[in-house]
């Protein structure tokens, strides 16, 4: 009997010591530990105590929380919305190779907002994505699995092009809406987390955002280091317009190439604006990089298409972006069973193919009641990071 009482007392002492040691951890150390965890774990720990909740919801923590960039993508099947996040980092940047990835793929499915236009999706900007439902922009936080409709624009702004920007100095996202179809001298800007009111911002550069034939330009704006870049038509011809997210000022950047260059995509190459396309005359691929914004200095890199390394690849893979390490990302236009991504470094001339398990294979289809048919219309978001920002 006495031995049992002694054991009980020992257990209670250990528990009390454990509680005192955990509660006595410095707040900065606790915050540092949380910052190294996956976002879904941090969200789960918010329910443990008021202290942990206050630490992980504080603006300084949510603004500084940043994970390693991943390749995120989704597809729709009926009213279901399947979201995947896969690693994109390269462990051997100086070598060409193929391998099957054993890393765990994070995935979930939810219900997609009805009557939303998936062709108006922006890129992933510091963890958030914006698209629209008619004239109503909607913000999506894939990490928190939340959608938030913004205040609807007035009737004069039915046809809009939506861009999403991020100011790294103040840590704020801004949604920029521009009319398309007609040239304009003004746009509408809304700062997330503020009073959610649209403000009018004017420019001295009358322009019309460039659109492809038959619709809105698909993700043709890019936010790089606090500046949104987009193609536009002006009275003097086609140019690139820049919008500084913090100062809310526009500027014009002249195109450096001639009529033989066909622009395919704008993207961020190691923190600088890059324009990828092809040369009609030489039948080659080129990448123009804006090396110096103030001096408008560009460099041009010419490289061979991926079909040079493996014939026929360009028939089945589409360019979707570039990693922070400078690798071009080619993704499949259709998935049946195996899901693989090609990463190509045009400067180093290294080529790697990665097969990811658990994406649209038989097990996945059985668990989610999907038919054994090809999956098309996948939407990809390179360099996506997790964010704990509340909408």
Swiss-Prot record:
Pfam families: F-box (PF00646), FBA_3 (PF08268). GO terms for cellular component: cytoplasm; nucleus. Residues 1-25 are annotated as: Disordered. Residues 1-12 have a biased composition (Basic and acidic residues). Residues 19-68 form the F-box domain. InterPro entries: F-box-assoc_dom_typ3, F-box-assoc_interact_dom, F-box-like_dom_sf, F-box_dom. Coiled coil: none annotated. NCBIfam families: F_box_assoc_1 (TIGR01640). PANTHER family: BNAA05G37150D PROTEIN-RELATED, F-BOX DOMAIN-CONTAINING PROTEIN. This is Putative F-box protein At1g47730. It comes from Arabidopsis thaliana (Mouse-ear cress).
């Amino acid at each position: 009997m006495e031995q049992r009482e002694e054991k009980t007392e020992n257990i209670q002492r250990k528990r009390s010591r454990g509680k005192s040691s955990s509660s006595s951890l410095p707040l900065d150390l606790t915050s540092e530990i949380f910052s190294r965890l996956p976002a879904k774990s941090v969200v789960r720990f918010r329910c443990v105590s008021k202290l942990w909740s206050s630490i992980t919801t504080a603006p300084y923590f949510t603004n500084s929380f940043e994970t390693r960039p991943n390749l995120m993508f989704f597809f729709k099947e009926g009213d279901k919305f399947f979201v995947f996040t896969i690693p994109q980092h390269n462990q051997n940047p100086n070598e060409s190779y193929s391998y099957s990835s054993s890393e765990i793929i994070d995935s979930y499915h939810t219900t997609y907002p009805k009557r939303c236009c998936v062709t108006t999706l922006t890129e992933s900007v510091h963890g958030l994505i914006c698209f629209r439902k008619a004239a109503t922009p909607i913000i999506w936080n894939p990490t928190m699995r939340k959608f938030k409709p913004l205040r609807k624009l007035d009737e004069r702004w039915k046809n809009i092009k939506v861009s999403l920007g991020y100011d790294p100095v103040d840590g704020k996202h801004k949604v920029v809406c521009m009319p398309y179809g007609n040239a304009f001298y003004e746009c509408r800007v809304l700062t997330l987390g503020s009073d959610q009111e649209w403000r009018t911002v004017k420019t001295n550069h009358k322009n019309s955002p460039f659109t492809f034939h038959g619709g809105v330009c698909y993700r043709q704006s890019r936010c790089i280091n606090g500046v949104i870049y987009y193609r536009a038509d002006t009275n003097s011809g086609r140019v690139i317009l820049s919008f500084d997210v913090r100062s809310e000022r526009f500027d014009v950047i002249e195109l450096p190439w001639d009529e033989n260059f066909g622009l395919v995509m704008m993207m961020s190459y190691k923190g600088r604006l890059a324009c990828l396309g092809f040369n009609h005359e030489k039948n080659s691929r080129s990448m123009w990089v804006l090396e110096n914004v103030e001096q408008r200095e560009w460099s041009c890199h010419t490289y061979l298409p991926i079909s040079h390394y493996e014939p026929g690849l360009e028939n089945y893979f589409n360019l979707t972006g570039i990693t922070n390490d400078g690798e071009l990302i080619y993704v499949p236009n259709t998935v049946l069973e195996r899901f693989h991504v090609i990463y190509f470094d045009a400067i180093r001339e290294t080529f790697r193919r990665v097969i990811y398990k658990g994406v649209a294979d038989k097990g996945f289809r059985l668990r989610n009641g999907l038919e054994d048919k090809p999956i098309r219309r996948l939407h990809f978001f390179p360099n996506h990071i997790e964010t704990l920002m509340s909408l």
